[in-house]
Each structure stands twice: as C-alpha cells, then as structure tokens.
Amino acid sequence: MSKRLSRTVLGVAVLSLVTLGLPATASAGQHVKAERTVADVVPAPVDAKPDPRSDFRLGPATVIRTDREGRQVAEYLAGLLRPATGYRLPVVSGHRGGGPAISLETGHASGRVGAEGYQLKVSRSGVSLKANTDDGLFLGVQTLRQLLPSAIEAKTVQKRSWVVSGGTVLDYPRFGYRSAMLDVARHFFTPDQVKLYIDQIAQYKINNLHLHLSDDQGWRIEIKSWPKLATVGGQTAVGGAPGGYYTQEQYKDLVRYAASRHITIVPEIDMPGHTNAAQYSYAELNCDGKPIPPRTDIEVGYSSLCIGKDITYKFVDDVIRELSAITPGKYINIGGDEAHSTTPEDYQTFATKVHPIVAKYGKTITGWHDIAKTKPPVSAVPQFWGTTGTDAHVAEAAARGNKILMSPANKAYLDMKYHPQTPLGLSWAGLIEVKTGYDWDPATYLQGVTEKNVIGVEAPLWSETLITSDHIEFMAFPRLPGYAEIGWSPKDSRTWDAYRLRLAKQSPRWVQQGIDFYRSTQVDWK
C-alpha cells in the first residue's frame, strides 16, 4: 500500500467516526486500554512485567523531571511527545514535587544494567526511568516511546487519550555493538536522508551507523588534500544517476546529529579494491599513470590501488588523517573486500603498510572479514559477510583475540530481495524473508566464533538498486528491528512465534512515521 493510499484510508476512518458522532477522546473517568504492554517491546527486554492496573495517563499537567546529566535526553523526549499531544511537557530540574511526571534519573540504576541498560517503572502516578549513563536513558526512552499509543508518532496534534502501559522493565544489551550500514557510494543520499535513517534506526537501540563512503561508482567525502576525489569522483553513481558528496562540514554535522541519537558514525573507505572512483579522479593512483573512465555498472573485483607506488600510501595517509580528524568514534573501516585483482602478496603488503597508518591517527581498524587473512592487530574487528558457516581465517582471528562483527550476507544483508518478485534489491546471497533474517544467532552461525568472540551484529544496506528514502525504508523494514533484537535481547528469550506477534504491533507506528515498509505475509499486521 502506498503512503498516499494509507493516509486516504486513515482519513476515511477518522471522518467516519466524526460522522457517527463518536467522541474524539475518552472521558476522564473512562478506562482506555493501552495498545501494547511492556512485554510487546522490540527489541525484547531482559525482564518485563506488565501491570495493566498501573497504566499512566499523560496529560496537560505532566512534566518531565530530570537531573543535569539527563537534560539532553529529557529535551529529546519532550520533542518526541509535544507534536502529537499538544502538551507543554516542561523539562524541570529535580525529582521532587507533586503532580504527574515522567522522571529521568542518571546514576541510580542497578549495576546489573551496565552502561546502556535502564530500569523503567510505569505506575498510575507517573513514570520513572533510571540508568547509569545518558546512553542508558536514551535507550530507555525508546522503550517508553513504544508504550504510548502509535499516534504519538504523528507530527500534528491528535485529540485522544495518551495511556502509557503499566509495569516494570529491567533491560540491558546482549552485545555492545549494534549497527546498521548505509551504502551512500553506489547511490548518493543527502544529509537529510541519512538523518532520517538515523532517526529510524535509533528507535530500535542501534548504536552505530557504518557509512560506506567510497566505491567504484562514487566517492562521497571531501578530502581537502585530494579535492578531485569529491569534485570528480563524487559526480558519478550507478546507472548514471546524479552523484554527490558530503563536505567535511556536512559530515561533521551528520556525526553530531547521530551523536544526539546516541549513534556513532563509522566511516568506510574501501581499499585496495573498489577504488575506481578514486583512480578515475587521480590518474597517478594507477600503476601506468594513465587516466581511466568512470564506472556506473555494478560489477565488482576489477579495481585496485597500485600497491608498489609510494603515492598510494601518501593518498591513504592523507585520507585517513583527514577522516580521523572529523570522526570522534574509535573505528575507521578500511574495507578490504573483493580485491580480486590484487594478488595475495600485494594484499598483504598493502595491509602491512596501511594498518600502522590507521593506528598513527589514533583509530582502530575494522573492515570486511577479508582482512582477517592479513593477521591484523588483535584490536582490529573483521566483519563477517560470508554465506557459509565456515571461514578458517575468521576463526583463526577469533582464536588470536580479534572480536568479530557478524553480518552474514544470507541472513543480515538488507538489500537482498524478500522474494523473487521484490522490485528492489539483489539475490546473489539468497532471498531473505523476515523469518530468515530473524531466525539465526551470531554466536553459533560461524564455526570457531562463539559468544565471547562476537562484538555484535550489523545489518548492511547496499544501494545498487536503491535511489530514494522510500527504497531504503522498504528494504530495511520490517527486517531491521529483527537484527536490532538479535543484537540486544537475550538469546533464550528470542523465538520467531513470539517475535512475529510483537513485530506486528510495530506497524501502526511505522504508518504514523510514514515508513514505507514491506508487508510480509509471514506477519499478521495490525
């Protein structure tokens, strides 16, 4: 169903209620049942105890109380709630005082919940959210958000009751690294489009966004010491679509925006392969020094930096230096995948020279699992993207102490088609329906990689076939919340039969948000 059609149906339903003379809101004394309970949240909490007798009604007199450390999260929460409710919801200091309140408090949660966990209690008199850090508060707010009616996501005032589902939650993540990847190289997405995706993934407790900033088809970040990377290499995209790039100021703004949603940007410069856009921009990066044409097809494996030329490492040093200076997060992704035209000896030589460059600028290496064969520093994080349960190099890296980021392509790639007739996406790794994407475990998928070896989970979204935000949404939803749950929720609490029921209750929120999601027949959508 298109967004326009969805809104038309919704409008007819509202008009029918008015025509019938039904009240727009419940009377003050009438009990209004909450849409969801604390046990319906996605990702599933560690411990959730519903109590319908403790539902809290948000009203015009409600205030948001917080301490100094929680002020930014409290303002974020108020910004979420004000448009649909029309209430003032002032943010006030301190946790004492009468009247209904949502209380956000840092530093007083159980040590059990750690840095990202939280404790939530909803009673008839108010809401109490406690965490040990502002990260935990922010993630707890995402749970609180789901306990309100779906209409809370509306951008205009809705005349209705605002019931927060009663009960208690104690929650913390299984893995500390929960990530999504957006390919902005094959097709370029504007800063506003990236910010929209940041907002969409933040609500499911994703805490990293991996931006694939370079590939054969386009270079997307300004490098001041090599300006043609952006002004030439940034002008192309798959199929001849318009290109684009981020200035360093725009990139820094994206980093700040993501941080306001408690998400860390992890930038990727893919090398030594997937480098045609760079080599097209600067002929001196080619072994023969001759210009090459741009590429707008989707073939892979043909490009390689010239491993034997000194200028290659000046290029790498300059790019890593400038990118590190505007990236506060600890990781720089150096790619490393599908370097089919680079010999194994050259690949190792390149790694031996590049790894110290990343360390020189104070960053930690992450990259596709192909880097595992170079025996990178034990701090490096190979990202597994294979489709089988065995990879000797990755298993050896895990045995040496490297943490592994799990993104098996036949389970976690968001650009894989749902079924053969899906109008977007590819199918080289197989078809990934919602159940297929959910029904696996990162600690048992790969031989030699167990719970202690896994840093987390990432859901990559490649953009060979994606041009608009609607395209991003259609391929990411409804699968993305499942990957978020795999990364957050206890393994033993996850079952497909229970998850599909909770997932179905998310769809009214997506409709309100305008998310153009795929309505899988595996889920009975609400």
Placement of each model-derived feature along the sequence:
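Flexible, acidic glycine-rich loops studded with aromatic residues
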Residues: 375, 386-526
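C-terminal segment of classical bacterial N-terminal signal peptides
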Residues: 18-26
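Conserved, mostly hydrophobic/aromatic
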Residues: 64, 81, 133, 180, ...
